Amino acid sequence: EYGLSLKDPKYNFVLIDMKHIKEANEKYILIKKAKESNIICRNALIYYYILNADNPNSQIIKYLVNRGAKFEVHDEGAYGWTPMHFWARRNNYQLLELAIKGGANVDMQTLLDPKSEYNETLLFEAVSEPETYRVTQLLIELGANVNFATPTTPLDDAKGSRNKKLLKDAGAMTSEQIRKKFNLPAYDSSHCEIDGKTDMDLLGKYHDEYSKLLNDAIKKAKESE
């Protein structure tokens, strides 16, 4: 289909039995079941291929995606990362480029809050370390949303002058700049304080509402361009 063969030793998985790969792919995500979520991530079909093939190829990744294999396999730990979020934080831009060109969402979110639609994207992880500016540059070049709000934006969280410059050159704004540009109400979570303590459910709901307000304003502005 892509002019490549899964049996070509150049692109082969590091597994003896190719039939096992075929069966695993037909079952979508996992090579084998495991209780530990980090092992599940490592053994998710696409990630297994990217990390273990002698010469991973984006066309083979597309082949797997078109047959149901998925990138959205999240660690069930504190951060809800996929391996791609780990790569972004660790400056693994080569693996990220391979995955995104193979069909992964350049704005893939964590599952820090599984109930929210506004978790941090790959770009947030990239800009959180000054040394990972090459990942930041790659994600921007591949179309990452530089103004996605959670309700903070990547520019709010960015560390290092190169990350900040890359974001600003791409049109990134802080959440406060977005608020002022579109004349939106100021962030105010004071109502989430009850008897001197923060009600986390109320705060999470307010974060989602305010995130939607910011993101909708950006989206509407883009649509009217």
Tell what function each PLM region has:
Residues 142, 159-225:
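Ankyrin-repeat-protein effector appendages
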Residues 21-31, 54-66, 92-100, 130-141, ...:
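Ankyrin repeat structural motif
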Residues 8, 23-27, 38-42, 54-57, ...:
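Alpha-helix initiation and capping sites
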Residues 8-15, 39-51, 73-84, 109-125, ...:
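Ankyrin-repeat boundary/"N-cap" motif
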Residues 1-48, 57-63, 189, 199-202, ...:
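N-terminal segments that cap or nucleate solenoid repeat domains
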Residues 6, 39, 71-73, 106, ...:
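Ankyrin-repeat inter-repeat connecting loop/turn
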Residues 16-20, 48-57, 86-92, 117, ...:
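Ankyrin repeat A-helix N-terminal signature
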